[in-house]
């Protein structure tokens, strides 16, 4: 399946977006970010930004869902998890398969 990218979203020229990825309006996928959804879907909500060198990956049975107005800090890894609206994932944080983070949360930088 090919990615679906809203016309108002920004995807950096060297970002990688593969498979069943949906990117909402006004979202930003920045330099060096990798979004891979070959085996389960990834959804990036409206107004969310995925900063430089992040990795978002989905596994069978573990889609990755990132809500609206979220910030995913530089070099964070989101793997088959759900991130609620208006949540900040700090730089270098790692969130793994099956994790569910609520809305209006902060995940500290380098947290696992």
Where are these regions (language model features)?
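Left-handed beta-helix
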Residues: 7, 12-13, 18-19, 24-25, ...
């Amino acid at each position: 399946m090919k990615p679906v990218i809203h016309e108002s979203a920004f995807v950096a020229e060297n970002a990688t977006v593969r498979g069943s990825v949906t990117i909402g309006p006004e979202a930003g996928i920045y330099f060096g970010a990798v979004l891979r959804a070959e085996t389960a879907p990834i959804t990036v909500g409206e107004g969310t930004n995925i900063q430089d060198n992040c990795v978002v990956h989905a596994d069978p049975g573990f889609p990755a869902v990132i809500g609206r107005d979220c910030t995913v800090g530089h070099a964070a890894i989101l793997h088959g998890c759900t991130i609620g609206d208006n949540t900040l994932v700090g730089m270098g944080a790692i969130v793994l398969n099956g994790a569910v983070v609520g809305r209006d949360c902060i995940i500290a930088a380098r947290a696992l």
